[in-house]
UniProtKB/Swiss-Prot annotation:
One of its GO terms (cellular component) is plasma membrane. Its main location: membrane. It is found in: Cell inner membrane. This is Probable manganese efflux pump MntP.
Length: 188
């Protein structure tokens, strides 16, 4: 795989994380750049590891991974998105609210895993090609770091406009990503 194909693959793989990061950034009360970078680093690290894991699994048992990865991603994203929607509906008026709580480490990791299962599936496919898997995984991770950090900062500006509805929107984005993963699996 040449450098152009690797870069296109890397940024293509980062789009789910970018969309999820916009939702995350919108639900926080004015996230700082350090929080955006933290999110980018977590998403980027997970997106670096998942193609490597997928590549290893592809060498061992690609059929099982390809049969189940879309369902795992779908369930995780529906759960996380549903949780965000419920929290958004339960919330009070924005004026009466304390500053929104920060997203915990494990919630970010879970979201990163859910949005990176497609990268794991790509890793399975890469196991059957002549590709430098380390360089490709690093490219995917770096692209995801950049796009997730950018997504959080974009979300920062959307959040105050939407208020508490941002959490509902973020949940809908995650559910939409899950549905898109399932749709793509069944309809190519």
């Amino acid at each position: 795989m040449n450098i152009t194909a690797t870069v296109l693959l890397a940024f293509g793989m980062s789009m789910d994380a970018f969309a999820a990061s916009i939702g995350k950034g919108a639900t926080l009360h004015k996230p700082k750049f350090s929080e955006a970078l933290r999110t980018g680093l977590i998403f980027g690290a997970v997106e670096t590891l998942t193609p490597l894991i997928g590549w290893g699994m592809g060498m061992l048992a690609s059929r099982f991974v390809l049969e189940w990865n879309h369902w795992i991603a779908f369930v995780l994203l529906i759960f996380l998105g549903g949780r965000m929607i419920i929290e958004g509906i339960r919330g009070g008026d924005d004026e009466d609210e304390e500053p929104r709580r920060r997203h915990g480490f494990w919630l970010l990791v879970t979201t990163a895993i859910a949005t990176s299962l497609d990268a794991m599936a790509v890793g399975v496919g890469l196991a059957f090609l002549q590709v430098n898997i380390i360089a490709t995984a690093l490219a995917i991770g770096c692209a995801t770091l950049i796009m997730s950090t950018l997504g959080m900062m974009v979300g920062r500006f959307i959040g105050p406009i939407l208020g508490k509805k941002a959490e509902i929107l973020g949940g809908l984005v995650l559910i939409g990503i899950g549905v898109q993963i399932l749709w793509t699996h069944f309809h190519g």
